[in-house]
């Protein structure tokens, strides 16, 4: 394990210029200024103001925040790394979000708003009754936040800074966490959403500049396929083919049996996982719940969906170019060569993006790209910090102290962020020892073992009136047992390195994690249905305004009092949103067909 430690990484000789330092300083100054400005605009002294931005956010910061929250530094490094390792197909994880984001705005948000909830476990408690499911989901969400989302983004961001600049790994981690937490604690959700909007702009501009320079290095887009096919390292392992780029690298749809990302799993399994992330996860849904009305929530989802089209060209293709330009480092397969290149024997695809930054970006622009990665890291972390504190405060603390006042709840919410920082920093050594070849695939594999049961409970709760608490609870437990079993087996039986036979159990070697997600969803759903049919039906109070079929028509999901909109204007913008949703799906289908 010591060989994989970050402390063993090669320290680059590149030093920051004065221009780079100025760019990074200006970035942080803008970030703090926007956070302070947005905090002054929103009321932070009420639970609704701190946790839901006073339910008065407009569509453009919501859309930008939805995008930025999902594009943390882990995704920047992970997507580029997976693109370098396997080609374009990983873009399906981004493009699939189009349909699920539309489902969020058109199906789930109306129900969440009409139920007058602040957190998603609160909705589950209203829909099913009882406290055990709500507590289960709150604790599970907090654990997932700490051990996957926060830790993964933190590790990837710190790895980027360490590789590019040679800064002390722990110092860069703690400083970034401290600044991130400062304006999250001070400003609540409004500060998070407005700083996300700023960081989205920085991320896109910086990534566009790097993409243009990367394509220029290989002679344009027309040369991408040929350049990638020739990205073979000079040192290989005899009698193996793992050093060769995939022959289907330019294909989105891959064979269900031999493909690394089979089209069946990317269509069905990924949709189940994406529904959990976009429609039932507190970090994401909280942004839509802050909308001033339903049209703004819909427009925010549409904007985020358009932005989710960009990573194919701005992250994944540059990752492929990085392997073409630096095959001995990014595409290494010999353990000793990988150890030299990035400090990890299992592979170095994760350094694809930072390698491009350090080799291609000139003085000044290098500082911009470092700011981009810091922006991605901080966008993701601020979102998770705020949403996790909301979960703990509203679902756990109020359960323990039902008489706690608003001042106490706000204080606890801020203290939870401090606690999350401590746990996350303590988890860094574990992540260092778990340094893997493809960070993004690891993240998705973990999600496939834990998310499908939650998706099943939410989907059945929304669309099936008969679903009750007993069925939902035992569906979650059955799914947790099966999913956790596979997860433990996966940690105990890692994939074999290049040139060694695969001796893992069949459930790991023969069943792709995306296919497993489908099976786990079906199992959990079957238990929910069986348990519900064998026990008494839910009470009417658990159905009214809480399912798609019983949503009251007179619930004020439209115009907000005092916003100056007439019913006619509201209906006009509703039609505009509907037209854009159809156009968006057409664009998405075109891209899928073009790269299929």
UniProtKB/Swiss-Prot annotation:
Protein name, as recorded: Sodium/mannose cotransporter SLC5A10
Source taxon at top rank: Eukaryota
Species annotation: Homo sapiens
Regions that span the bilayer: 16-36, 73-93, 100-120, 150-170, 174-194, 201-221, 265-285, 301-321, 356-376, 410-430, 444-464, 472-492, 514-534, 576-596
Extracellular topological domain residue ranges: 1-15, 94-99, 171-173, 222-264, 322-355, 431-443, 493-513
Membrane topology: Multi-pass membrane protein
Tissue spec. comment: Predominantly expressed at high levels in kidney. Very low expression is detected in testes.
Residue list for modification Phosphothreonine: 148
Cytoplasmic topological intervals: 37-72, 121-149, 195-200, 286-300, 377-409, 465-471, 535-575
């Amino acid at each position: 394990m010591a060989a994989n430690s970050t402390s063993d990484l090669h320290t680059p000789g590149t030093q920051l210029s004065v221009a780079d330092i100025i760019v990074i300083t200006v970035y942080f100054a803008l970030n703090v200024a926007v956070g302070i400005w947005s905090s002054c605009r929103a009321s932070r002294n009420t639970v609704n103001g701190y946790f839901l931005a006073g339910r008065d956010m407009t569509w453009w910061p919501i859309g930008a925040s939805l995008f930025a929250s999902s594009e943390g530094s882990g995704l920047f490094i992970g997507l580029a790394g997976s693109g370098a390792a396997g080609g374009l197909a990983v873009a399906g994880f981004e493009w699939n979000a189009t349909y699920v984001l539309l489902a969020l705005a058109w199906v789930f948000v109306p129900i969440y708003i009409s139920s007058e909830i602040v957190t998603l476990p609160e909705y589950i408690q209203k829909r099913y009754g009882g406290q055990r499911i709500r507590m289960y989901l709150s604790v599970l969400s907090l654990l997932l936040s700490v051990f996957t989302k926060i830790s993964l983004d933190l590790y990837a961001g710190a790895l980027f800074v360490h590789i590019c600049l040679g800064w002390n790994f722990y110092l860069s981690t703690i400083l970034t966490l401290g600044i991130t937490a400062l304006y999250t604690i001070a400003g609540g959700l409004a500060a998070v959403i407005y700083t996300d909007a700023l960081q989205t702009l920085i991320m896109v501009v910086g990534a566009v500049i790097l993409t243009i320079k990367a394509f220029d290095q290989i002679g344009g887009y027309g040369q991408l396929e040929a350049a990638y096919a020739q990205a073979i390292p000079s040192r290989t392992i005899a009698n193996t083919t793992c050093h060769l780029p995939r022959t289907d690298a330019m294909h989105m749809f891959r064979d269900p049996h031999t493909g690394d990302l089979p089209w069946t799993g990317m269509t069905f399994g990924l949709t189940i996982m994406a529904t959990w992330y976009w429609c039932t996860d507190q970090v994401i849904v909280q942004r839509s719940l802050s909308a001033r009305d339903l049209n703004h929530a819909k427009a925010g989802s549409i904007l985020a969906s358009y932005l989710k089209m960009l990573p194919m060209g701005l992250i994944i293709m540059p990752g492929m170019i990085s392997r073409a330009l630096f095959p001995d480092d990014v595409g290494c397969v010999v353990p000793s060569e990988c150890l030299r290149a990035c400090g990890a024997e299992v592979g170095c695809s994760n350094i694809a993006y930072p390698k491009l930054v350090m080799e291609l970006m000139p003085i000044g622009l290098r500082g911009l790209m470092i700011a981009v990665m810091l922006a991605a890291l901080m966008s993701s972390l601020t979102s998770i910090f705020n949403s996790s504190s909301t979960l703990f405060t509203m679902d756990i603390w109020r359960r323990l102290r039902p008489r706690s006042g608003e001042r106490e709840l706000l204080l606890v919410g801020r203290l939870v962020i401090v606690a999350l920082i401590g746990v996350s920093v303590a988890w860094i050594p574990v992540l260092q020892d778990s340094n893997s070849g493809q960070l993004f695939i690891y993240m998705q594999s973990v999600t496939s073992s834990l998310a499908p049961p939650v998706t099943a409970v939410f989907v059945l709760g929304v669309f099936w009136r008969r679903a009750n608490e007993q069925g939902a609870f035992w569906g979650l437990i059955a799914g947790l047992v099966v999913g956790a079993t596979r997860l433990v087996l996966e940690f105990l039986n890692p994939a074999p390195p290049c040139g060694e036979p695969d001796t893992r159990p069949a459930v790991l070697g023969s069943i792709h994690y995306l296919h497993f997600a489908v099976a786990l969803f079906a199992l959990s759903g079957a238990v929910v249905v069986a348990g519900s049919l064998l026990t008494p039906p839910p009470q009417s109070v658990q159905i009214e305004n809480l399912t798609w079929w019983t949503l009251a028509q007179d619930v004020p999901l439209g115009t907000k009092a005092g916003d100056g909109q007439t019913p006619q204007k509201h209906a006009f913008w509703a039609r505009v949103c509907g037209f854009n949703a159809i156009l968006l799906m057409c664009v998405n289908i075109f891209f899928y067909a073009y790269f299929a």
